[in-house]
Every structure is written in C-alpha cells, then in structure tokens.
C-alpha cells in the first residue's frame, strides 16, 4: 500500500508569520532608549525679590561670584537662580537697545530721503531760503533803482539849474536889451551894450565848460551815490 504524501508548508505561507529582521530590532531598541526631556521648572520670584534684583541690575549688570552668593542668601534664592536671572536680563537689555537703534537709524534714513510727494524733507527749509533770497534781491533792486533815480533827478535838476542860472539869464537879458535899443540910440550906447552881452556870453561858456569836465561829473556822481534816501 502506498503511504499518503504530506504537503510541506512553505515558509512564506506558514501561519506563524514573518520573523523581525535585525534592522527592525535595532530601531525598536533605539526608540525604547530615547530619553524623555524633562521640563524645566520656572522659578517664580516674589515682588520683593524682583524689586531687589532690578535695583541691583540697574546699578551693576555683572556680578562676581561672591556678590551673587551674597545676593542669593539675602533673597533666599540659589546661586544658579540669581545667575540665570542676570543672564536673562542682560539678553533682554541688549535686544531692547538693538531694536531702538534700528528704529532710530530707520527714522534718520527716511528723513534724509525724498518723500513720495517729491518735496524735500522738513529739515531742508527751501521756502525760507527762497523767500530770504528774494527779499535780498528786491532790496538790492530797490536800492539800485533809488540810486539811479537819484542820479537822474540830480543830473536833470543840475542841468536845469545850470541853464537857468543867473549867468545864462544875464546873457539873455543883455541880448534882449540890445535888441530893444531904438534905431535912434547913440553908437556909443550900442557898443557898450554889445560889450556887456559879450562878457555875459563868455561867463556862460566858461561855466558850462567847467561843469562839463570829467572831474566835475565824477565828483557829482560820487556825491549822489553816497547820498542816503533821507537826504533826497
């Protein structure tokens, strides 16, 4: 009789399941060995302790070992607690100073740059400069106009005075007196009148030549330039 053949179970289809590999075993061991981080306990300071610590930090930011021990004994704190508090305060102070420095530097940079409207910054008072310059220009122009008008007026008045002077009138009167002689006047009287008229004309010509010289005109112009507005 033939014996029945028993089927051999394949390892892949066996009901026992897969065996874990060495890599998986090592990974599970590492996960088991990961330590759990302990949360640091924060020290809660009382108001009195904070007041003393802040006052000491304002006066002295770095304490020696002996000073920290003395302060910790006074406040009933540990040396480590006092040291940690001072370290944290120094970091906060540096961060605060850095932020203020950045704000101040940004404000100065924005003040130096031109704003979007196209106007200049406030510290550059362009309007004041323009108004001052225009006022100075107007004063110069008004003074120059006043000087020129003074020269013109004085020259015209002087010319009028020169031509209307008694010498000129004297010559005219002499000529008019000559013209008014009657035909029956003696020859001696006519000759005397002509001589008098000639002397008057000579005086007028000499006076006109004197006032027409460059030295006299320069002297007169300098005098008119130095005259104050009140003198005109």
UniProtKB/Swiss-Prot annotation:
Residues 1-39 are annotated as: Disordered. Residues 123-167 are annotated as: Sufficient for transactivation activity. It is found in: Nucleus. SUPFAM superfamilies: Homeodomain-like. Its main location: nucleus. The keyword Metal-binding does not apply. Residues 168-232 are annotated as: Sufficient for strong transactivation activity. InterPro entries: Distal-less_Homeobox_TF (IPR050460), HD (IPR001356), Homeobox_CS (IPR017970), Homeodomain-like_sf (IPR009057). Probable transcriptional regulator. This is Putative homeobox protein NANOG2. It comes from Homo sapiens. The lineage of its organism: Eukaryota, Metazoa, Chordata, Craniata, Vertebrata.
